[in-house]
Amino acid sequence: MTSFREMRFDDLFKINSLVFDALTEVYSLTFFVKHLSQFPGLSQVAEAPGPDGRPMGYIFGQYQLKKTQEPYGHVAALTVSSEYRRLGLATALMDYFFMVSDLKGASYVNLFMRISNQAAYQLYTSMGYAHRQTFADYYPDDPQPESAYELRKYVPRPLEVQ
């Protein structure tokens, strides 16, 4: 049975093999260390059963609290190993992050994704995320940059009656 737990610094070396998947954005070790330091409790790893606890997937999240806008959660990175896709791991990781963002008082959760990744788009929209805007040439790939969709899912809040 898959186990889910909070990401630790020593996991960064274990998840390295997942980073080289064609559908995964490649970030530096510094990126991941910074996220674990700045946003404790917002990153989670899914582990395979067995003594080695092989990583099956992970999510890195952020919580943004700026004076100029409402607080929100941001999915910085979500990856599930190709051999474990279609098992509901991405949904479980996203649901976890949405719940934590809600508990922290977020108004919504957002993410950015490549417009060519239709499987991810279908997953996110099936979970209630909606297209907010498109950013041209967001991913500066060689030789051809690719645009990104920003998707959002709002946290339901009760209406206040006065």
Predicted regions and their residues:
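Short coil/turn segments at alpha/beta junctions that flank glycine-rich nucleotide-binding fingerprints
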Residues: 87, 104-107
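Conserved acetyl-CoA-binding loop-helix of GNAT-fold acetyltransferases
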Residues: 80-82, 86-99, 118, 122-126
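Short amphipathic alpha-helical segments embedded in low-complexity Lys/Glu-rich regions
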Residues: 31-37, 109-116, 137-140
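Short Asp/Glu-rich motifs
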Residues: 38, 120, 143
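Acetyl-CoA-dependent GNAT
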Residues: 2, 9-83, 94-104, 154-160
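Conserved catalytic-core motifs of GNAT/GCN5-like acyltransferases
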Residues: 110-112, 125, 130-150
